Curated annotation (Swiss-Prot):
PANTHER family in the cross-refs: HYALURONAN SYNTHASE, MANNURONAN SYNTHASE
Chain's role: Involved in the synthesis of Nod factor, a sulfated N-acyl-beta-1,4-tetrasaccharide of N-acetylglucosamine which initiates a series of events in the host plant species leading eventually to nodulation.
Similarity remark: Belongs to the NodC/HAS family.
GO biological process: extracellular matrix assembly; hyaluronan biosynthetic process
EC top class named in words: transferase
Gene: nodC
The name this protein goes by in its record: N-acetylglucosaminyltransferase
Membrane topology, as annotated: Peripheral membrane protein
Major localization class: membrane
One Pfam family matching this protein: Glyco_trans_2_3
UniProt-listed Enzyme Commission number(s): 2.4.1.-
Gene Ontology CC: plasma membrane
GO molecular function, one term: hyaluronan synthase activity
Organism, as annotated: Rhizobium sp. (strain MPIK3030)
Compartmental location: Cell membrane
Amino acid sequence: GSARVSACVASIAKQDYAGELRVYVVDDGSGNRNAIIPVHDHYACDPRFRFILMPKNVGKRKASIVAIGKSSGDLVLNVDSDTTMRRRVASKLASKSRIREDAPTILMRNAGFRTEYVPEAIAETVVPNSMNAYLRQQRRWARSSFADTLAVLLLLGLDRYLTLDEIGGNLGPLLLALSVVSGLAQLALTATVPWS
């Protein structure tokens, strides 16, 4: 709701980043557009903030693409509306590189972008507070993870361990589901269970 969006944007506004900060707040055409109105009213005169209202629901990915298309900085940080950041996150992310991250980071580097990992940069997020919200989140994440697996051909030329990690991360749950279905089928057909 509005309180989450306000907390997120306020945490970005308070960043101690010394460089030029541009913030694109994108409403992806959600059904709850009223949540962004108080945030817009509060930051409309702040030159660091731009508000983009998508005419129809396009989803997070396309909303992110719109914001990234408007960006011209060296550092692009994508934040969900339910995330709040500590004051030094942007400055720590903009500091000297210390370590390489995982597959999406390698793909970005391969495309010519510079990426940074700073272990001291901590963000907090709101966790689902109901089983339905949790299941929706997990379904969303599973779709995203499966889409990453479909991009495995992009990983093949980069790092075999990352490729195996990506495949294994999606193969495990599929094998678990197959195991449960097989067990239930055995129970239904033979009145025995394979794990006794």
